[in-house]
C-alpha cells in the first residue's frame, strides 16, 4: 500500500495499547502515526516504540489528540466509555475514522456511536477476535436448533483488573441468542443468583462472572437439556489476537464510507 493508514493508539502504555503498537508495527498497510496517554502521565514525550521494546518509531507520546491531529487518519480506542466519547467528538470534528473496542457503554453512549456513524466510519465491537466472531455465528445456529427447550447459561472470566461485568463479549453473546429466539435480553437476562431463587425460568438467559489473576478472556455458552448439553467456548491466551483483529478492522474501514460497523461486517459474516 503506497499510503499506509496512520493510526493513533489511545492509552498506548496500557495493556491493550502496548499490544496494539506491536500489532500495527508488524502489519502491512498501517503505521503508528500517534500514541496517546492521559495528561500528566510520566511517559509523555517518550518514543512509543522504545518504551515498549519495539525500537525507535519516531512517534513521541502525546497527551492530546489536537496536538497531533495532522499525524493520523484513524483512532483505535480501547479505553473507557467517557474517554472514548470525548475522542469520538474529536473524530467527528476532524473527520477521523475510529475502531472502538471500549466496553461498558450505557444506552446514551451507544446512541452517540450510532449517530456518529452517520458522518464518519466506525467499527465498534465488543471483541475483535476472529474466533469469537465465529462463535457468534455458531451461537445463532445453536439457538435456532436448541434454544427453545434448553436452559441457556453464559459464563465468562477475565483478569482481576477488568472493571465492568459481565464482559461486553458475554453481553453480545447473550444478545445474539436472545435476538435469535425473539427475546429482549434486558427482560430475560439473570445476572448471578443468590439465596432462595426458586426454580429456573426456561425463558431466562443466565450470566456468571469470574474475575481472577491474569485471565485474558474466556467465554462459554451452555445449552443444557436433561441428559445432554452443548457448550460453545472460546479461550484467548494473548491480547494480541484482539489487537490483530482491531488492526484488520482498521484496514477494512479505510475502504469504507461513513457508517457504524462491527466485526461481522469486517469478516463478511453477515
UniProtKB/Swiss-Prot annotation:
InterPro entries in the cross-refs: DapB_C, DapB_N, DapB_N_CS, DHDPR_bac, NAD(P)-bd_dom_sf
GO CC, any one term: cytosol
Keywords from the named record: Amino-acid biosynthesis, Cytoplasm, Diaminopimelate biosynthesis, Lysine biosynthesis, NAD, NADP, Oxidoreductase
Molecular function, one GO term: NAD binding
EC identifiers of the protein: 1.17.1.8
GO biological process, one term: lysine biosynthetic process via diaminopimelate
Keyword Ligase part of the UniProt annotation: no
Compartments where located: Cytoplasm
PROSITE patterns in the cross-refs: DAPB
Binding site for NADP(+): 38
Binding site for NAD(+): 11-16, 37, 101-103, 125-128
Domain of life: Bacteria
Catalytic residue positions: 158 (proton donor/acceptor), 162 (proton donor)
Positions of (S)-2,3,4,5-tetrahydrodipicolinate binding: 159, 168-169
Catalyzed reactions per annotation: (S)-2,3,4,5-tetrahydrodipicolinate + NAD(+) + H2O = (2S,4S)-4-hydroxy-2,3,4,5-tetrahydrodipicolinate + NADH + H(+); (S)-2,3,4,5-tetrahydrodipicolinate + NADP(+) + H2O = (2S,4S)-4-hydroxy-2,3,4,5-tetrahydrodipicolinate + NADPH + H(+)
Pfam family, one: DapB_C
Keyword hit for Cell membrane: no
Function description: Catalyzes the conversion of 4-hydroxy-tetrahydrodipicolinate (HTPA) to tetrahydrodipicolinate.
Listed HAMAP family: DapB
Protein family membership: Belongs to the DapB family.
The name this protein goes by in its record: 4-hydroxy-tetrahydrodipicolinate reductase
Naturally occurring in which organism (per UniProt): Aeromonas salmonicida (strain A449)
Amino acid at each position: 500500500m503506497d499510503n499506509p493508514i496512520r493510526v493513533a493508539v489511545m492509552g498506548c502504555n496500557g495493556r491493550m495499547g502496548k499490544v496494539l503498537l506491536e500489532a500495527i508495527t508488524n502489519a502491512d498497510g498501517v503505521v503508528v502515526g500517534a500514541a496517546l496517554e492521559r495528561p500528566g502521565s510520566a511517559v509523555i514525550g517518550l518514543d512509543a516504540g522504545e518504551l515498549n521494546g519495539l525500537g525507535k518509531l519516531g512517534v513521541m507520546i502525546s497527551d492530546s489528540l489536537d496536538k497531533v491531529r495532522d499525524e493520523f487518519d484513524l483512532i483505535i480506542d480501547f479505553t473507557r466509555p467517557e474517554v472514548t466519547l470525548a475522542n469520538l467528538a474529536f473524530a467527528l470534528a476532524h473527520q477521523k475514522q475510529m475502531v472502538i473496542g471500549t466496553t461498558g457503554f450505557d444506552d446514551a453512549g451507544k446512541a452517540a456511536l450510532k449517530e456518529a456513524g452517520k458522518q464518519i466510519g466506525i467499527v465498534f465491537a465488543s471483541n475483535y477476535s476472529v474466533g469469537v466472531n465465529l462463535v457468534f455465528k455458531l451461537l445463532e445456529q445453536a439457538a435456532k436448533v436448541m434454544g427453545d427447550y434448553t436452559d441457556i447459561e453464559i459464563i465468562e472470566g477475565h483478569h482481576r483488573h477488568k472493571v465492568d461485568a459481565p464482559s461486553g463479549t458475554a453481553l453480545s453473546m447473550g444478545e445474539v441468542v436472545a435476538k435469535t429466539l425473539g427475546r429482549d435480553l434486558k427482560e430475560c437476562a439473570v445476572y448471578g443468583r443468590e439465596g432462595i431463587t426458586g426454580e429456573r425460568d426456561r425463558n431466562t438467559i443466565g450470566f456468571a462472572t469470574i474475575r481472577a489473576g491474569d485471565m485474558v478472556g474466556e467465554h462459554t455458552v451452555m445449552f443444557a437439556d436433561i441428559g445432554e448439553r452443548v457448550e460453545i467456548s472460546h479461550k484467548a491466551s494473548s491480547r494480541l489476537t484482539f489487537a490483530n483483529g482491531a488492526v484488520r478492522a482498521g484496514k477494512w474501514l479505510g475502504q469504507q464510507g461513513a457508517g457504524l460497523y462491527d466485526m461481522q461486517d469486517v469478516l463478511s459474516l453477515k
